Design a protein with these regions (language model features):
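Conserved beta-strand-loop surface patch within small alpha/beta domains used
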Residues: 1-93, 102-164
């Protein structure tokens, strides 16, 4: 395991347990949520499960939203509003998380090209947060990886791992 270290926000054991429990509850769909932490500290302590609205989007317009929640996630407008509002407060959003479910590769905790595109606007991060991707299989959580923006590479890169 590669530990996450400052200045990057590390998940507390309680937040990680909450994320893993959320991922297991949502199987076979991808879960998604936001982790908040104290302003000015590299801690991500309060995991808040969000509703993955991808199935709704897919049902409304399957041409535009070709994937359903088994292979994609989408945070709703209300959750994004709360994320944005938190950035001005004492407990800002530090991490956005989601799961990859039963992927056909050895390690499902990766930041896909779709994830890269969704996390950026005009080649820059959409929000000043990092991302955690959970590798979820039928038999449980295998682990997670954390990704941060690398301005030199102009993309999110893996900075640490959490055990399953």
């Amino acid at each position: 395991m590669t530990a996450v270290s400052p200045p990057h926000p590390a998940l507390t054991p309680e937040a990680l347990a909450a994320i893993y429990a959320h991922a297991r509850r949502e199987h076979p769909n991808e879960c998604c949520g936001i982790v908040y932490g104290p302003k000015g500290q590299p801690i991500a302590a309060r995991a808040v499960a969000c509703v993955n609205i991808q199935n709704e989007l897919h049902a409304e317009d399957p041409v535009k939203h070709t994937r359903d929640a088994t292979t994609a996630y989408n945070l709703g407008a209300g959750d994004l509003f709360k994320l944005g509002k938190s950035l001005r407060g004492e407990e800002p959003a530090k991490i956005v998380y989601h799961s990859h479910v039963d992927v056909e590769r050895a390690d499902g905790a990766y930041f896909s090209e779709t994830d890269q595109a969704a996390a950026q606007m005009d080649g820059e991060p959409s929000y000043p947060v990092e991302y955690v991707v959970v590798d979820l299989r039928r038999d449980g959580v295998r682990g997670a990886a954390q990704f941060a923006w690398d301005p030199g590479a102009r993309r999110y890169v893996e900075i640490g791992r959490y055990p399953g």
